[in-house]
C-alpha cells in the first residue's frame, strides 16, 4: 500500500500528504509544513511519470527517481529523446559522451550543454511552443530542474497529440516514496526557492498556443467533453468534427471506438483530478477534469493507429499484398519509406514478423514500431536484392572479359552477398567460373550457382594455400567440410589424402600451375580410395597364401600366389615346390624371432620369398650344368678345358690356380677311374645339395632339372660331385703352396740366423758393463781422498804467509774503510744535485695535496668552512677570454634568431608562391571544363557560370586547394608537431584511457607519429615520450616499488616491445646467438634438475635395456627419488653442466653492455632515477633488482627461452627446437633469472641449494652489469639536439598517418583536453580551437557522404596522408628578470665575494664585524681599479648594470654595511638564517665556484652548437633563396605561357621583327552586366549602364591588366588589376570584389573573361 494512500482498519481512505482529517486540528505552521510536503510528493510523482515515459520512448533504464534530476544534467538522455522524435535534427553520432563514460569518470563538461541545445532544437523542429522551454543553465547548472520536468510533460502530451509517443501516466497517489525521500526533495525545493510550474494547465496552454480563436476552441473542446459524457457516439463524432476543435484524421467508421476510448480517458482524468483536489487548496483549472484538445487528438490518433494495425493484421491473414499496401498507407500510422513496388516484400517480411511474435507467445497484433521496422527491413531486403542482381550481372561480365583481378573484385563486392573470396586465388576463380559459365545453357551464372561455386572454390583456394604453408590441419578441415562438396571422403584415409595432395601440389608447381583445381582434388580422393580398396583385397589374398602354406600343398600354394589381387610378380609354376619350401621356412623363422607361433608372412616377405626362390632355381641350374661340364672335361683329357670348367663361378670352387692345371686333370681323372672301376649304373639323374640345404635334381641327358624328386630316382655312380672335386683341388693346391713358400722366404731365414748370433755377442758386452758399474763407489772414494790432500796443503801455506806480514795488512784495511765512507758521502751529495727537480716536485706535491684536500672539502662538505671558500673565490673572476666567449655567444645567438626569423619569412613566401602556382594550375584545369560548356550558356543559365568556376574548389579532401582546407591541413600539422615535440600531452593521454585502448593507441598512432624512430630526430623525441610517460606512470600509478616487477606497467611493456622488435633484434642476436647455437649443437647436453624426472628417465632406461619391468615404483616423491645413488649422480652431472653453460651465457651478457640499444639503457636509467626519487629509502640493491627485471627478465629472458620466436637463431624450413633443447634453455634462463634477482633455491628446490653460492657470485656480476648499463649520456648529449634543431633542417619532418588515426587522435584530445592541459593558456587549447569539431572521414578524404554502415568506410579510414609538421609558435625570446629575492641574494653574494677575498676570517659574521686594515683596503682598491679598466673594454651589451658599477666604487667597510642590509632583507624573506652565521650564503658561493667550470664547458659547447646551427641556417637560407627565385621564374613562365596562348598572340605578325600591338577590350557596363561580370555600380541606375565603358588592356608586366572607366566618353579612373590577386581571392572564397571602390564584379566570371579573351582558354 502506498505512502500517499493508506486504508485504516475501518476501511476509510486516509488522506495524502498535506490533508487534514476531520478530527485533526493543526496550527498554521503545521499546515504550511504539510503543504510543502505535498508539493514535494507531487513533484516526485511528476519525476516518476517523466522517468517512466522516457524509458518507454528510449527503451532503456533511467536513474532512480530521486537521482533523475542529476542524471538529466549532462543532457544525454534528453538528446536521445530528441533523436527519438526528431532523428533528422539529433543524430546519435552528435550526442556528446553518449555512453556517459566521461561523465562517470570526471563529471560534467561544458560540452554536455551541446546535448541540451540539440534537444531544444528538436522540440523547435516539431513545433512545441517555446513557452515550455527551459534555459540551458536551468538543466546544466540545476538552477530550475522542475522547469525541465514541466517541459518533458508538455512534450509528452504534444507528441501524444501528434501520434509520435505514448501518453504519459498520472501516478499521483499510485507510487511510494519514503519520508526521507520526500523530506530531501522538500529541502531541495526550498534551497533553490523554485516556484513549481502548473503541470495541470499544460493542456490548456497548448490549446491557447494554437493560432485560432481561443474562445471558439475552448467552447468546442467543452462541447466534445459534454458529448462524451452523454455517451452517444454519433453526437460525440459530430462534436469532434467541429472545425473550431482543430481535430484531424477523423474517421466516421471509428466513432463508437472514439466514444469508448475518450470516455475512459475522461473518467481516468476525473479520478486523478478528484484525488488531487481533495488534498490541495490550490486554485483548480477547468482542464483538470476535462480532456484537452491535445488529449482528444492523441486519443483519436491512438484509435486510428489501433484500427490501422488491425487492418494490417487482417491483410496479413488474407495474404493480399494490395490490401496490405493500402493499410500501410494509412495516415494514422505515418509510416516512412513506403514503396509501391515493394508490396510483396512487405507481405513476406510482416508475415514473418507476425509469425515470430506468435511463436514467442504474444497474441496481440504488430505494433506501429514493429510495422515500421518491418517496412524498413523489407525495403532494405528489396534494395539488397536489386543490388545483388546488378552485382551478379557485373560478375558474369567480368568473367567473360577474362581479367582475373576484375573478376575477384566483383566477387568481393558486398552487394553480391557471396561467401568469402580470397584475392590470392584470382586465377583459380577466373578459370573455374569461366568453365562453369560456358557449360551453362544461358552462358550466365545465377546467384545460387555463384554461391555454391564460390564457396567450393574458396575452400579449394584455402586448401592450396594450406598445402603451400604445410598446414595439414587446415587442409583436412577443408577437405572434410561439406562446403567443399567433395564426395567419398573417408576419415581413416586422412593422411593418405594429405600425402597425395602434397605430391599433386608439387607436380602442379613443376608444371607452372599455381593451383590444383576441385576436379584435381576429387580425382586425388578417388585415387586414394581405390588404392586403399586394392590394399584391402591384397590383405585378403595374403591370408589365403598363409593358409595354403600351412596345408603343405605346393599346388594350392601356387594357386594362392597366382591370385590377381595379391599382385605378386615372378610366380612360376615349375618352382612351386621351392616356393612352398622357402616360404614355409621363412614363416617358421619369423615365428621363432617373434616367439609367436601364429605369425604370418606379409606381402613383402612373400614377394621376397618368390624372388629368392626364382634366384635359387637359376643358381641351382647353372651349378648343375657347371658340375656336368667338369666331368665331361675330365673325361676328354683336355687340361685347358678342365681348368676353364673348374674356374667357372657357377660351381663356386675355390683355390684353383692355373699352375696346377695338369695336376688337377690327372688327380680328377684318377678319381673318376676309381668310380668307374666300382661300376657304372648308367643313371641319367644327378642330385645336388645346394645352398639353403635343398636338393636339386639334374637330368644329364636333357640338361634340365627341378626341385621335386623324379619318380624312380637313382643317383649316377660315375659322376664326381662338387665335394669330391673340391677335395681334390684343395689337396693339389696346398702341396703347391708349401713348395712355393720355402722358395720365396730364403732371405728371411738367413737374416734370422744373423740375429741370433748378434744376440749372443751383446749379451757378453752387457755382462762386462755390469761389473764396472758395481765398482763405482770404490773408484770415487780413491779419487776424493787424493783431491782433499792437495787442497789442505795449499791453505796451510797461505795462512803462514799472512802471519808473517801482519802490520801491512792492518794499514791496507784502514785505507779501504776511509775510501768507502768518503765515497758514500760524495755519492749522496751528488744524488741530491742530480735530483733537485724531483725534490721541487715533491714539495709541490705536498702543497698541492693540501690544496686538493681543501678542494675536496669545498666539493664534498655539506657546510664548507669560510677559510676553504676564501681560497677559491678567485675562480669566480671573469677573465678576458670569458668576456670574449660571452660576447661571441650573445652575438651568435642574436644572429641565429635573426636568421631563423628570416628563414621563417622565406618559408612563408615559399608557401604563398606554392599556393599561387597551384592556383595557376588549378585555374587551367577549371577553365577547361568552363570553356567546354561556355558555348551552351543562355541568358537563363548564365548565373551558373560562377558555380562552374568554383566546382573544383568543392572537390578534394584535406589537401584540397582551398583556404578552408589549407587552414585545416595546417592546423593538423601544427597539432601533430606540438604532440611530437612536447611529450607531456601524449604521456598524460595514455593514462587517461583504459589499458587495452591505450595499448592500441600506442601501437597505431604514437609509433606512426614518430615514424617508428626511423631517424635520430624521431628516436630522440620518442625516447623523450617514453621518459616522460614512465615518470608520469611511476608518479601517479606506482604506490609500492615492487609493483614495477609484479605488475605490467604500460610504458615498460611498450619500451621492451619496441626495443625487442626490428630495432633491437639484431642486438639480441649478436649477444645471444653464439651461445644459444652452441647449446643447440651439443646433442649430448641434457639438463634435468627435477629429481622425479631424473628418476623416471632412469627407470625407463633400465627397462629399455633389460627388456623387463622394473621392480622400482614409478610414482615417487623428490625425497624418495634422491635416496637412489644413481639419481644423485645424474643430478650432480646436470647441475655441473647447467652451471657451465649458464656461465657462458652470463659472460656473453655482461660483456656486451655496449651492444644493448641506447634506448633500452636510457629507459633503465630513467626507471632507476624515478624510483629513487619517489622511494628515497629504497636501497641500491633493490633498485638494481628492478633494473635487472627490465634488462634481463623482460628484455633478454624470452629470447633465451624461445630463440626461434625472436629470430635469435635460423632454423630450416619445418625445423623446430627439440624438447630437450627447450628444456635446457628454460633451465638456463631460470638460473639467470635467479642470479639477476639474487634469488636462492629454497623449499621445493632445496636439492639445488648447492648452487646458491654460485648464484650469489653471479648476482654480483649482474649488479655491476646493471650499474654500467644505467651509465649513459643524456638524450641531448647523445643526439646533439636543442631548440634550434628543427629550424636548421632543409626538409621538415613528415609523418604518414591514416585518416582514421587523425580522427581518433582528435577525438581523444577533445575528450581529455582538460586532463592533459589543465592550464587555459596552454598552446594545445588554441590548436584544438583552430580545428573545431571532429571532422568526418568523408570530409577529410573528399568523398561524398555515404551510408554510415557503408562497408567501404573502414577501408576509407585506412587511407594514409602525409603531414609536413610545422611549429605554429615562435622561438621564445629572453625575458628580463624582476628585482626579487633572487636579485637581492645575487647582489649580496657578489659583495661577500669581494670582501672575503681581501679580509680573512673564520666566519662571515666575524669578517663583517672586524674592521679592515689599511693594507686590506689598499689591496681592495687596487683590485677594483683593475676591474674598472677591464670593464671599460667590455662591449655595451655586456656591460654591468649601473648598481653593479656603483658597488665597485665602494670601500670594504661600505660593502660590509651593504651586505648587512641585504642580509636583513634576506632574513625577513626567510632565505638565510643568522643563527648558523649565514652558512647558506657560503654554501651558495661554494656551489657557484663548483659550477663555474661546468658553466664554461657548457658555454663552449653551446657556442660550437650555435655556430653549427648558424652554418646550417645559412645553408637553409641559400636553399630557400634558390627556391624563391625558381618559383618566381616558374610563375613568370606560367603567366608568359598563358599570354603566349592568348588571342592577341594568335594574330599573324605583319612583318618579321615587329612587335605585335597589344589589343585592349572594350565593354559597356550593360554588356558586362548581361554577362554577369558586373553586378552593380553604386549611385548609378541600371538603365545608365549603357553610358559606362570599361577598357581592359594588358600591361608590359605579364599578369597585370589596366582597367579604364569612361562615363559618356569621359575618362574617369584607372585601376590596376593583378591576375594573381584574382586567383588569391578565388582561393579565399571571395565571390565579389570592388573596382574603383564603386563597381562590384563577380570574381569568378571576371577570371573567366580574362582567360577567354587574353589567354585563349
From Swiss-Prot:
Domain WW, chain residue ranges per copy: 685-710
Q: Which GO terms describe its molecular function?
A: calcium ion binding; calmodulin binding; MAP-kinase scaffold activity; mitogen-activated protein kinase binding; phosphatidylinositol-3,4,5-trisphosphate binding; protein domain specific binding; protein phosphatase binding; protein serine/threonine kinase activator activity
Q: Which residues form the IQ domain?
A: 745-774, 775-804, 805-834, 835-864
Residue intervals of the Calponin-homology (CH) domain? 44-159
Q: Which domain of life is it from?
A: Eukaryota
Q: Where in the cell is it found?
A: Cell membrane; Nucleus; Cytoplasm; Cytoplasm, Cell cortex
The Ras-GAP domain covers which part of the protein?
1020-1269
Q: Which UniProt keywords apply?
A: Acetylation, Calmodulin-binding, Cell membrane, Cytoplasm, Membrane, Nucleus, Phosphoprotein, Repeat
Residue numbers carrying Phosphotyrosine = 172
Where is it expressed, tissue-wise? Expressed in the kidney (at protein level).
GO cellular component term, pick one: focal adhesion
Modified residues annotated as Phosphoserine in this record: 2, 330, 1441
- Chain segments carrying region C2: 1276-1657
- Sequence segments annotated as region (C1): 956-1274
Could you tell me which residues carry N-acetylserine? 2
Q: Which GO terms describe its biological process?
A: caveola assembly; cellular response to calcium ion; cellular response to epidermal growth factor stimulus; cellular response to fibroblast growth factor stimulus; cellular response to platelet-derived growth factor stimulus; epidermal growth factor receptor signaling pathway; fibroblast growth factor receptor signaling pathway; fibroblast migration
Q: What does the record give as the function of this protein?
A: Plays a crucial role in regulating the dynamics and assembly of the actin cytoskeleton. Recruited to the cell cortex by interaction with ILK which allows it to cooperate with its effector DIAPH1 to locally stabilize microtubules and allow stable insertion of caveolae into the plasma membrane. Binds to activated CDC42 but does not stimulate its GTPase activity. Associates with calmodulin. May promote neurite outgrowth. May play a possible role in cell cycle regulation by contributing to cell cycle progression after DNA replication arrest.
* Domain remark text: Regions C1 and C2 can either interact with nucleotide-free CDC42, or interact together.
Assembly mode: Interacts with CDC42; the interaction is demonstrated with IQGAP1 in GTP-bound and in nucleotide-free state. Interacts with RAC1. Does not interact with RHOA. Interacts with TSG101. Interacts with PAK6. Interacts with SASH1. Interacts with PJVK. Interacts with SLC26A4. This interaction enhances the chloride-bicarbonate exchange activity of SLC26A4. Interacts with SVEP1. Interacts with ILK; the interaction is required for localization of IQGAP to the cell cortex. (Microbial infection) In case of infection, interacts with S.typhimurium protein sseI.
Task: List the protein's name.
Answer: Ras GTPase-activating-like protein IQGAP1
* Species whose genome carries this gene: Mus musculus (Mouse)
Amino acid at each position: 500500500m502506498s505512502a500517499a494512500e493508506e486504508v485504516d482498519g475501518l476501511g476509510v481512505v486516509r488522506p495524502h500528504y498535506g490533508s487534514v482529517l476531520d478530527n485533526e486540528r493543526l496550527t498554521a505552521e503545521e499546515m504550511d509544513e504539510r503543504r510543502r510536503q505535498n508539493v514535494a510528493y507531487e513533484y516526485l510523482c511528476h519525476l516518476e511519470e517523466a522517468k517512466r515515459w522516457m524509458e518507454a520512448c528510449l527503451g532503456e533504464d533511467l536513474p532512480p527517481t530521486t537521482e533523475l534530476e542529476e542524471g538529466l544534467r549532462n543532457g544525454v538522455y534528453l538528446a536521445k529523446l530528441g533523436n527519438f522524435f526528431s532523428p533528422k535534427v539529433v543524430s546519435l553520432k552528435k550526442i556528446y559522451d553518449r555512453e556517459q563514460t566521461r561523465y562517470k569518470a570526471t563529471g560534467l563538461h561544458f560540452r554536455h550543454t551541446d546535448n541540451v541545445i540539440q534537444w531544444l532544437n528538436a522540440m523547435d523542429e516539431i513545433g512545441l511552443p517555446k513557452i515550455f522551454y527551459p534555459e540551458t543553465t536551468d538543466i546544466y547548472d540545476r538552477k530550475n530542474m522542475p522547469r525541465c520536468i514541466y517541459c518533458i510533460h508538455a512534450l509528452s502530451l504534444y507528441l501524444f497529440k501528434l501520434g509520435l509517443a505514448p501518453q504519459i501516466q498520472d501516478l499521483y497517489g499510485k507510487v511510494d516514496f519514503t519520508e526521507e525521500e520526500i523530506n530531501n526533495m522538500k529541502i531541495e525545493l526550498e534551497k533553490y526557492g523554485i516556484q513549481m510550474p502548473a503541470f495541470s494547465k499544460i493542456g490548456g496552454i497548448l490549446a491557447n498556443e494554437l493560432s485560432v480563436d481561443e474562445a471558439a476552441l475552448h467552447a468546442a473542446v467543452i462541447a466534445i467533453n459534454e458529448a462524451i459524457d452523454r455517451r452517444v457516439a454519433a453526437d460525440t463524432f459530430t462534436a469532434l468534427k467541429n472545425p473550431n476543435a482543430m481535430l484531424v484524421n477523423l474517421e466516421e467508421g471509428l466513432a463508437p471506438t472514439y466514444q469508448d476510448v475518450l470516455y475512459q480517458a475522461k473518467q481516468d482524468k476525473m479520478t486523478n483530478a478528484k484525488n488531487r483536489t481533495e488534498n490541495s487548496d490550490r486554485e483548480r483549472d477547468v482542464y483538470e477534469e476535462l480532456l484537452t484538445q491535445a488529449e482528444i487528438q492523441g486519443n483519436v490518433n491512438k484509435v486510428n493507429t489501433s484500427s490501422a494495425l488491425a487492418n494490417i493484421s487482417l491483410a496479413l491473414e488474407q495474404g493480399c499484398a494490395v490490401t496490405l499496401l493500402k493499410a500501410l498507407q494509412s495516415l494514422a500510422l505515418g509510416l516512412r519509406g513506403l514503396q509501391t513496388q515493394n508490396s510483396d516484400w512487405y507481405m513476406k517480411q510482416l508475415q514473418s514478423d507476425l509469425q515470430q511474435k506468435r511463436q514467442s507467445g504474444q497474441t496481440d497484433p504488430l505494433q506501429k514500431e514493429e510495422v515500421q521496422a518491418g517496412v524498413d527491413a523489407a525495403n532494405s531486403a528489396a534494395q539488397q536484392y536489386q543490388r545483388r542482381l546488378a552485382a551478379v550481372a557485373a560478375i558474369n561480365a567480368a568473367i567473360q572479359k577474362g581479367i582475373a583481378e576484375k573478376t575477384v573484385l566483383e566477387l568481393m563486392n558486398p552487394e553480391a552477398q557471396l561467401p568469402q573470396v580470397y584475392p590470392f586465388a584470382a586465377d583459380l576463380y577466373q578459370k573455374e567460373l569461366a568453365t562453369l559459365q560456358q557449360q551453362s545453357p544461358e552462358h550466365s551464372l545465377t546467384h545460387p550457382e555463384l554461391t555454391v561455386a564460390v564457396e567450393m572454390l574458396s575452400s579449394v583456394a584455402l586448401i592450396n594455400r594450406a598445402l603451400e604453408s604445410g598446414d595439414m590441419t587446415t587442409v583436412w578441415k577443408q577437405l572434410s567440410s561439406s562446403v567443399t562438396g567433395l564426395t567419398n571422403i573417408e576419415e581413416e584415409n586422412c593422411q593418405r589424402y594429405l600425402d597425395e595432395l602434397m605430391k599433386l601440389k608439387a607436380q602442379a608447381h613443376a608444371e607452372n600451375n599455381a593451383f590444383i583445381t576441385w576436379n584435381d582434388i576429387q580425382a586425388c580422393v578417388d585415387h586414394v580410395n581405390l588404392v586403399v580398396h586394392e590394399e584391402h583385397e591384397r590383405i585378403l589374398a595374403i591370408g589365403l597364401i598363409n593358409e595354403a602354406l600351412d596345408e603343405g600343398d605346393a599346388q594350392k600354394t601356387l594357386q594362392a600366389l597366382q591370385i590377381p589381387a595379391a599382385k605378386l610378380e615372378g610366380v612360376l609354376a615349375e618352382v612351386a615346390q621351392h616356393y612352398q619350401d622357402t616360404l614355409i621356412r621363412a614363416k617358421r623363422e619369423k615365428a621363432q624371432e617373434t616367439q609367436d607361433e601364429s605369425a604370418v608372412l606379409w606381402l613383402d616377405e612373400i614377394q621376397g620369398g618368390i624372388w629368392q626362390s626364382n634366384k635359387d632355381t637359376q643358381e641351382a641350374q647353372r651349378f648343375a650344368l657347371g658340375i656336368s661340364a667338369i666331368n665331361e672335361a675330365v673325361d676328354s683329357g683336355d687340361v685347358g678345358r678342365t681348368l676353364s670348367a673348374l674356374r667357372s663361378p657357377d660351381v663356386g670352387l675355390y683355390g684353383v690356380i692355373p699352375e696346377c692345371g695338369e695336376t688337377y686333370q690327372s688327380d680328377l681323372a684318377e678319381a673318376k677311374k676309381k668310380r668307374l672301376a666300382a661300376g657304372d649304373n648308367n643313371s641319367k639323374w644327378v642330385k645336388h645339395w645346394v645352398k639353403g640345404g635343398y636338393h636339386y635334381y639334374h637330368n644329364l641327358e636333357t640338361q634340365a632339372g627341378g626341385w621335386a624328386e623324379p619318380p624312380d630316382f637313382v643317383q649316377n655312380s660315375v659322376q664326381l660331385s662338387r665335394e669330391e672335386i673340391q677335395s681334390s683341388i684343395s689337396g693339389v693346391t696346398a702341396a703347391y703352396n708349401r713348395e712355393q713358400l720355402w722358395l720365396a722366404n730364403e732371405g728371411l731365414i738367413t737374416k734370422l740366423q744373423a740375429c741370433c748370433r748378434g744376440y749372443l755377442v751383446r749379451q757378453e758386452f752387457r755382462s762386462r758393463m755390469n761389473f764396472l758399474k758395481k765398482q763405482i763407489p770404490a773408484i770415487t772414494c780413491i779419487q776424493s781422498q787424493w783431491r782433499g790432500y792437495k787442497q789442505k796443503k795449499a791453505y796451510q801455506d797461505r795462512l803462514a804467509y799472512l802471519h808473517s806480514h801482519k802490520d801491512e795488512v792492518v794499514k791496507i784495511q784502514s785505507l779501504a774503510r776511509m775510501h768507502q765512507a768518503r765515497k758514500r758521502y760524495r755519492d749522496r751529495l751528488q744524488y741530491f744535485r742530480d735530483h733537485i727537480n724531483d725534490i721541487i716536485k715533491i714539495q709541490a706535491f705536498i702543497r698541492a695535496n693540501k690544496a686538493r684536500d681543501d678542494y675536496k672539502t669545498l666539493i664534498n662538505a655539506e657546510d664548507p668552512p669560510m677559510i676553504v671558500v676564501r681560497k677559491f673565490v678567485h675562480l669566480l673572476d671573469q677573465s678576458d677570454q670569458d668576456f670574449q666567449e660571452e660576447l661571441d655567444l650573445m652575438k651568435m645567438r642574436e644572429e641565429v634568431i635573426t636568421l631563423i626569423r628570416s628563414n621563417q619569412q622565406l618559408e612563408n613566401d615559399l608557401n604563398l608562391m606554392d599556393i599561387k602556382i597551384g592556383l595557376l594550375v588549378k585555374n587551367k584545369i577549371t577553365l577547361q571544363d568552363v570553356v567546354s560548356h561556355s558555348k551552351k550558356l543562355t541568358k537563363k543559365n548564365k548565373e551558373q557560370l560562377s558555380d562552374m568556376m568554383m566546382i573544383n574548389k568543392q572537390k578534394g579532401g584535406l589537401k584540397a586547394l582551398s583556404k578552408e582546407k589549407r587552414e585545416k591541413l595546417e592546423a593538423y600539422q601544427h597539432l601533430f608537431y606540438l604532440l611530437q615535440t612536447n611529450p607531456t600531452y601524449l604521456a598524460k593521454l595514455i593514462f587517461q584511457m583504459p589499458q587495452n585502448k591505450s595499448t592500441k593507441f600506442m601501437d597505431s598512432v604514437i609509433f606512426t607519429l614518430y615514424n617508428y624512430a626511423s631517424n635520430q630526430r624521431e628516436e630522440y623525441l620518442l625516447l623523450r615520450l617514453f621518459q616522460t610517460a614512465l615518470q608520469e606512470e611511476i608518479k601517479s600509478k606506482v604506490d609500492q616499488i615492487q609493483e614495477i616487477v609484479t605488475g605490467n606497467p604500460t610504458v615498460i611493456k611498450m619500451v621492451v616491445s619496441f626495443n625487442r622488435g626490428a630495432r633491437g633484434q639484431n642486438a639480441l642476436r649478436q649477444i645471444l646467438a653464439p651461445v644459444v647455437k652452441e647449446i643447440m649443437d651439443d646433442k649430448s647436453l641434457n639438463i634435468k634438475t627435477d629429481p622425479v624426472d631424473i628418476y623416471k628417465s632412469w627407470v625407463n632406461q633400465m627397462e629399455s635395456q633389460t627388456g623387463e619391468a622394473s621392480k622400482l615404483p614409478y610414482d615417487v616423491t623428490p625425497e624418495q627419488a634422491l635416496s637412489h645413488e644413481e639419481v644423485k649422480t645424474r643430478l650432480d652431472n646436470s647441475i655441473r653442466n647447467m652451471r657451465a653453460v649458464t656461465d657462458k651465457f652470463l659472460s656473453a651478457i655482461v660483456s656486451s653492455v655496449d651492444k644493448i640499444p641506447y634506448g633500452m639503457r636510457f629507459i633503465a636509467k630513467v626507471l632507476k632515477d624515478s624510483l629513487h626519487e619517489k622511494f628515497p629509502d629504497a636501497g641500491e640493491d633493490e633498485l638494481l633488482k628492478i633494473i635487472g627485471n627490465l634488462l634481463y627478465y623482460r628484455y633478454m629472458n624470452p629470447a633465451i627461452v624461445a630463440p626461434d620466436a625472436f629470430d635469435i637463431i635460423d632454423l630450416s624450413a619445418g625445423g623446430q627446437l627439440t624438447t630437450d633443447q627447450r628444456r635446457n634453455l628454460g633451465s638456463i634462463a631460470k638460473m639467470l633469472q635467479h642470479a639477476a634477482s639474487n634469488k636462492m633455491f629454497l623449499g621445493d628446490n632445496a636439492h639445488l641449494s648447492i648452487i646458491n653460492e654460485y648464484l650469489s657470485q653471479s648476482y654480483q656480476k649482474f649488479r655491476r652489469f646493471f650499474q654500467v648499463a644505467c651509465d649513459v649520456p643524456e638524450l641531448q648529449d647523445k643526439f646533439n639536439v636543442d631548440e634550434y634543431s628543427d629550424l636548421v633542417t632543409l626538409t621538415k619532418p613528415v609523418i604518414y598517418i591514416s585518416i582514421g588515426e587523425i580522427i581518433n587522435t582528435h577525438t581523444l584530445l577533445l575528450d581529455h583536453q582538460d586532463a592533459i592541459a589543465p592550464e587555459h593558456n596552454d598552446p594545445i587549447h588554441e590548436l584544438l580551437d583552430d580545428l573545431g569539431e571532429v571532422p568526418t572521414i568523408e570530409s577529410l578524404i573528399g568523398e561524398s557522404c555515404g551510408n554510415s554502415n557503408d562497408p567501404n568506410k573502414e577501408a576509407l579510414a585506412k587511407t594514409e596522408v602525409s603531414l609536413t609538421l610545422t611549429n605554429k609558435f615562435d622561438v621564445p625570446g629572453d625575458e628580463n628578470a624582476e628585482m626579487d629575492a633572487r636579485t637581492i641574494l645575487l647582489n649580496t653574494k657578489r659583495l661577500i665575494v669581494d670582501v672575503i677575498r681581501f679580509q680573512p676570517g673564520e666566519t662571515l659574521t666575524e669578517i663583517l664585524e672586524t674592521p679592515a686594515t689599511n693594507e686590506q683596503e689598499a689591496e681592495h682598491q687596487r683590485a677594483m681599479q683593475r676591474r674598472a679598466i677591464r670593464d671599460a673594454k667590455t662591449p655595451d651589451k655586456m656591460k654591468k648594470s649601473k648598481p653593479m658599477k656603483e658597488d665597485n666604487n665602494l670601500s670594504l667597510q661600505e660593502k660590509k654595511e651593504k651586505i648587512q642590509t641585504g642580509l636583513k632583507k634576506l632574513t625577513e624573506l626567510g632565505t638565510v638564517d643568522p643563527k648558523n652565521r649565514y652558512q647558506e650564503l657560503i654554501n651558495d658561493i661554494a656551489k657557484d665556484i663548483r659550477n663555474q667550470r661546468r658553466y664554461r664547458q657548457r658555454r663552449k659547447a653551446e657556442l660550437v652548437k650555435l655556430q653549427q646551427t648558424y652554418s646550417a641556417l645559412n645553408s637553409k637560407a641559400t636553399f630557400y633563396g634558390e627556391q624563391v627565385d625558381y618559383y618566381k621564374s616558374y610563375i613568370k613562365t606560367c603567366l608568359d605561357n598563358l599570354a603566349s596562348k592568348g588571342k592577341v598572340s594568335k594574330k599573324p605578325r605583319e612583318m618579321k621583327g615587329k612587335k605585335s600591338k597589344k589589343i585592349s577590350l572594350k565593354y559597356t557596363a550593360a554588356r558586362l552586366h548581361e554577362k554577369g561580370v558586373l553586378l552593380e555600380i553604386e549611385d548609378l541606375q541600371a538603365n545608365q549602364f549603357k553610358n559606362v565603358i570599361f577598357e581592359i588592356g594588358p600591361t608590359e608586366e605579364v599578369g597585370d591588366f589596366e582597367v579604364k572607366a569612361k562615363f559618356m566618353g569621359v575618362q574617369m579612373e584607372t585601376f590596376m588589376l593583378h591576375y594573381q590577386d584574382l586567383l588569391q581571392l578565388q582561393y579565399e572564397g571571395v565571390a565579389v570584389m570592388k573596382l574603383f571602390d564603386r563597381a562590384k564584379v563577380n570574381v569568378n566570371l571576371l577570371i573567366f573573361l580574362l582567360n577567354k579573351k587574353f589567354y585563349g582558354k
